[in-house]
Amino acid sequence: MKKSMQWMLATILICGSCVFTSCTNDSKDNPSQPEQSEKTYSASTRELITLVNSHAQLKSLLEKAIAKGTEINPDRETNPAQTLSEYYDFVEWAAHAMPWTVINQPEGTDIFTRIDQSLNLFFFINDIPLEELDGQSLYNNSLQYFEPYRSWLKTFAKAWGAYLDSEDSWNQAYYDIVVKEDTFGISKGWYEDASNWKTFNQFFARKLKSPDVRPIASPEDNSVVVSPADACTQGVWQIDEEGYIVQDEDAGVQVKSKKFSSIAELLGPNSQYRDAFNGGTLTHSFLNVYDYHRYHFPMTGKVKEVNIIEADYAVGGTITWNPKTKKYDLFCDTPGWQSIETRGCVILETPDYGVVALLPIGMMPVTSINWAPEVKVGAEVTKGQELGHFLFGGSDFVILFQSGISFKLKPQLFSHQLMGEELGRLI
């Protein structure tokens, strides 16, 4: 896993016959394509059109972002939405597309790259820097954080999520491709019977067939913290005495304001533990497209608090176009962006290591945090017990330890771990 990860979240398969063409040419260049007034759009696209037509500044900003995107990447194969009407066509298509068909890719491109590039493409325009938005205390000066477009992204995400919850999103052909693509581990015998998967999201949140396929390291020793998910480790950061993540000045810091590196902000307004981790430690791990997307308790303890913090459906990191590789790159290894994303938070009280915060982070485009039924305040839980699951979208998992607790990461930075393997030790 590279430090400047091309991640994406999200997840699988290919439909070679499904090629997006409706927005690769404007109607004036394609007489067979109906004019905008003749087209029938779904509710989420109609909502965007209404917002743009009634909000002059939004229209100006969106048109400017599209124009800048076209200047950066004029290739219509990898940037098909180059006018406002084409953008409407694009989001209409994307809301009913499989994650690997949003962007055209050369024949033979693997599923991981197709999904990664499809999702990065969707947020390429949304993440274009706009000087008009400078100084407005946004995470960055891009359209995805500007109201009312910010709220519309949630509408879009829910529409896409609804499609991926439908039986239209899964069939035998998709399953066959997943089996062929060994990175998803289907052939390893880890997962439940495939007949349980009736939708894409059921596949995405697939269950293990038995706890035995993910043995838990040192189950009786709480000083051994296990990986909460199949994920790539991203590092360990200190939290200062005021509750802010200590950033590496040489790391190309993405956090533009102390607000976004605040642990109190990360834990959300309803937590009683907003200051409990001042002087402590943060570690986080990134779940990739092909990973098992259920997360588990990394330690044994008692649940003290359970919250879901509704926030943005934004990219979080920074997306750039690389003209040499002809690919979109996402940079999201530096922490801080998690505080803008919709996320969950469980506070776990441990016998010997104080309270620990466990935060599954839902990432764009279809953020979804779901708790296991047993996860309730007062519940006694054991290391390796299921905590919850993600549906479609990118995924990250943050763990916070209190001051005075030393955490040493075991695996090499950016290495991949299976859930239950040793993540590190507490001293």
What kind of region is each of these model predictions?
Residues K2-K3, D29-Q33, W371:
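Intrinsic low-complexity, intrinsically disordered segments enriched in polar/basic residues
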Residues S17-S37:
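Bacterial Sec-dependent N-terminal signal peptides
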